[in-house]
């Protein structure tokens, strides 16, 4: 369910803010949480609003600074390091869930699916910055709060992943999920 009074509603968030979300401190103990490092896939959210994006239903832009010592580069793959594409997809789901908490949604966030994903590039240790852009399409506020969005992942100025119909739901009880 949605809560009309959302504390800490800002248009940008620092890394410390994102860590607070992972501890359940940003949107309250019954609000959605971001994962903790090493699964947190962003360093900051640089823009959030409820009326922007391609569909005028909300927009999120976040960034990840690429460093050669990020944990996944050491194992994916040995001698051929590349960020797993699924982590970029997960980052987009993380941001849709964060948006649902930002607008007052309550519950535990779970990815529910994606319409289509295209990978047309890769993120290597030599890259500098990844930018995630999420264009909210719809928010359903019933027994289940669900958000749907399109997103893209850009590395050093080039869009390399696109996803349509990213779906995230907020659940009061995940035992039957």
UniProtKB/Swiss-Prot annotation:
Subunit (UniProt): Homodimer.
InterPro entries hit by this protein: FabA, FabA_FabZ, HotDog_dom_sf
Keyword set, alphabetical order: Cytoplasm, Fatty acid biosynthesis, Fatty acid metabolism, Isomerase, Lipid biosynthesis, Lipid metabolism, Lyase
EC number: 4.2.1.59, 5.3.3.14
GO aspect biological process, one term: unsaturated fatty acid biosynthetic process
Purpose of the protein: Necessary for the introduction of cis unsaturation into fatty acids. Catalyzes the dehydration of (3R)-3-hydroxydecanoyl-ACP to E-(2)-decenoyl-ACP and then its isomerization to Z-(3)-decenoyl-ACP. Can catalyze the dehydratase reaction for beta-hydroxyacyl-ACPs with saturated chain lengths up to 16:0, being most active on intermediate chain length.
Pfam families, alphabetized: FabA
Gene3D superfamilies hit by this protein: Hotdog Thioesterase
GO MF annotations, alphabetized: (3R)-hydroxyacyl-[acyl-carrier-protein] dehydratase activity; trans-2-decenoyl-acyl-carrier-protein isomerase activity
Matching NCBIfam families: fabA (TIGR01749), PRK05174.1 (NF003509)
UniProt name for this protein: 3-hydroxydecanoyl-[acyl-carrier-protein] dehydratase
Protein localization: Cytoplasm
Domain of life: Bacteria
Active site: 76
Biochemical pathway: Lipid metabolism; fatty acid biosynthesis
UniProt GO cellular component terms: cytoplasm
Family: Belongs to the thioester dehydratase family. FabA subfamily.
Principal cellular location given in the protein's record: cytoplasm
Chemical reaction(s) catalysed: a (3R)-hydroxyacyl-[ACP] = a (2E)-enoyl-[ACP] + H2O; (3R)-hydroxydecanoyl-[ACP] = (2E)-decenoyl-[ACP] + H2O; (2E)-decenoyl-[ACP] = (3Z)-decenoyl-[ACP]
